Structures are given as C-alpha cells and as structure tokens.
C-alpha cells in the first residue's frame, strides 16, 4: 500500500517485484520466483477469490507452476489474513510450508514494517524445520499456526496473535526458532470442490429477538452465532435458533470473548447447555470468524462441522 493523496487514503500499489526490491537480501536466504496473482484489498476477498488463491497455492506447491518449491510466501492485506490462513490450513497438504505476512504501515510511512515481515516470512518458508507445518502467519517476529492466527490489534505493529493457543515459533536475529512440534501447526486437510455453501455470522446483542437470524435463514446454509460469555444468548433469540435447526441447518455457537471457548454450563432459557441440548454445536477453540470458515469449508465438502 501507498498513500494516494488524490484518493484520500492508502491504496494497493506494489507488485511482487517491487516488494522484493524493498527487501534486499532475500536471494541470500533462498532462491525464489515471483507470482503476481493479484492486488486486492483484504476486505475484497470473498469466497470465490479465496478459493482461487487456494488453488493457486496448491498448484505452486505441487509443482504445476514450475519447480516444486521448498516453501511459499504470500503477501496479504491484514484485515482478512485470518480467513485466508484458516482456509489454507484446512484444505492444503501441510508438507510444503506456506508463510503468510503483510504490513501494518505503508511504504509511504517511515516505520513501514513490510520489508521486515517479508524477510521473516521468507526465512520461515525456507527453513527445513517448517516442513510439514502447513500454513503459518509470520508477523512482527512471531510465527503462528494458520488455523489459530487472528488479528488482535486494529493498528498496532504487533497485530496478530493466537487467542486459543500460543505462537509456534519466532524469528529473531535472522534465525527461525520453533517452540512446538510440526503436529501443532498442521491440520488434516478437507477437500471441498469449492466454497459453495453460504454461512452467516451473527452477533448477539442485549435484548436480541432473533430478527437477523430469521432474515439470514432464508438465504444461508448454516450460521455461526456470536454469543455472550461461555455461550449464552437472549431468550428472545432462541425461537429463531430453533427454526434454523428445524430446517436441518447447522447452528454453531461461538463466543464474543477474545479468549476462551464456549462451555455449555448454563441451563436457563438461552443458556449454552439448553442450546446444545437443542442441537446447537459449540465452536471449539475458534474465534467466530474461524468458526464460520470451518463451517463454510465443511458444508461445502458435505461434512459435519469439525470435519
């Protein structure tokens, strides 16, 4: 991104060659080739584009685009890195490592973090210890499992974390150090033909009567409900949730809390235990957006939530 005064803000500008030019010394880490797939703001990445990118990465990893690489680096807008990282983690063979990175500042800023993050990502992708770890997010010196990584800061340089885990490694002084085994990064892949299902994500609000749930039910195949606390919703929303279930459409229950996961212990109307007894599915160790990606992938593959 660069600052465009006529547009009044930051816009996508640099292709792969330009980004590499800003990070001298990459060839000393590993030989590379550049694939300019596209220049899209992260918030423009819908299911079709996500799947197109996934297929491009799979083709590169299998050697269809040239010599089979030791690793792959993706530069990506930070807003939706977590969706892309989750998708790749769940649908690609983990043998060839994929390192996703980006920047929280633009090349117009003095403290641009892009070149440093790119260099770190190349180090991770090229490191022999990355083999079998699948997709990782490399940002501000942290290495995060792709299926756990989420954006936790809107503007800070250290923008990514793993609310349901911990970093799996770090890059410090040019060295990649992993703190856990490869099994902690990789997931068993699911292979849908595409992202064909439609999944809604609906946050609960105080006094919710389920209107948004009813509106979404007509055009979606499943829904992630972003509940309070350990998985509780206002009683007024319960009939709408039951209408989803009555139509055979899965309802996944996530929490709006930054840390922790749904624990169905409350049996009052709208309580998590009551909802699970009705057939609602706890999201597990996933943020609401990760739970939505999981449900989207599984429904597209004809599978139940959780693969």
Language-model features: locations:
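Short beta-strand segments
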Residues: 74-76, 99-102, 136-140, 203, ...
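Internal gly/pro-rich beta-alpha loop/helix module
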Residues: 100-172
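ATP/nucleoside-binding phosphotransfer catalytic cores, i.e., glycine-rich phosphate-binding loops
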Residues: 231, 235-307
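Accessory alpha-helical/coil subdomains and C-terminal extensions
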Residues: 15-28, 145-232
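Short acidic, glycine-rich surface-loop motifs adjacent to enzyme active sites
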Residues: 67-81, 219-230
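Short Gly/Thr/Asp-enriched flexible loops that form oxyanion-binding sites at enzyme active sites
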Residues: 74-96, 233-242
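ATP/NTP phosphate-donor binding region
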Residues: 1-62, 239, 259, 282
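A glycine- and small-aliphatic-rich helix-loop capping segment at beta-alpha/alpha-beta transitions
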Residues: 2-17, 80, 86-98, 114-120, ...
């Amino acid at each position: 991104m660069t600052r465009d005064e006529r547009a009044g803000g930051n816009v996508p500008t640099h292709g792969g060659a330009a980004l590499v030019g800003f990070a001298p010394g990459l060839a000393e880490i590993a030989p590379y080739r550049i694939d300019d797939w596209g220049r899209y703001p992260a918030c423009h990445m819908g299911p079709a584009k996500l799947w197109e990118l996934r297929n491009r990465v799979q083709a590169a990893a299998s050697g269809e685009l040239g010599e089979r690489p030791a690793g792959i680096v993706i530069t990506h807008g930070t807003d939706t890195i977590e969706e892309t990282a989750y998708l790749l983690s769940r649908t690609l063979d983990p043998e060839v490592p994929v390192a996703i990175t980006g920047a929280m500042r633009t090349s117009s800023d003095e403290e641009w973090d892009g070149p440093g993050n790119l260099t770190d990502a190349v180090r991770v992708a090229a490191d022999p210890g990355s083999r079998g770890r699948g997709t990782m997010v490399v940002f501000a010196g942290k290495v995060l499992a792709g299926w756990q990584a989420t954006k936790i800061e809107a503007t800070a340089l250290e923008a990514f974390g793993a609310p349901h885990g911990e970093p799996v490694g770090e890059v410090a002084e040019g060295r990649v150090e992993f703190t856990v085994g490869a099994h902690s990064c990789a997931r068993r892949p699911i292979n849908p033909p595409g992202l064909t299902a439609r999944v809604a994500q609906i946050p609960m609000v105080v006094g919710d009567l389920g209107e948004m749930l009813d509106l979404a039910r007509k055009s979606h195949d499943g829904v992630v409900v972003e509940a309070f606390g350990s998985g509780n919703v206002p009683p007024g929303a319960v009939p709408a949730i039951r209408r989803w279930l009555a139509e055979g459409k899965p309802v996944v229950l996530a929490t709006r809390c930054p840390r922790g996961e749904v624990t169905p212990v409350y049996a009052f109307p709208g309580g998590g235990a009551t909802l699970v007894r009705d057939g609602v599915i706890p999201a597990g160790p996933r943020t609401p957006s990760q739970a939505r990606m999981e449900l989207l992938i599984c429904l597209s593959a004809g599978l139940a939530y959780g693969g």
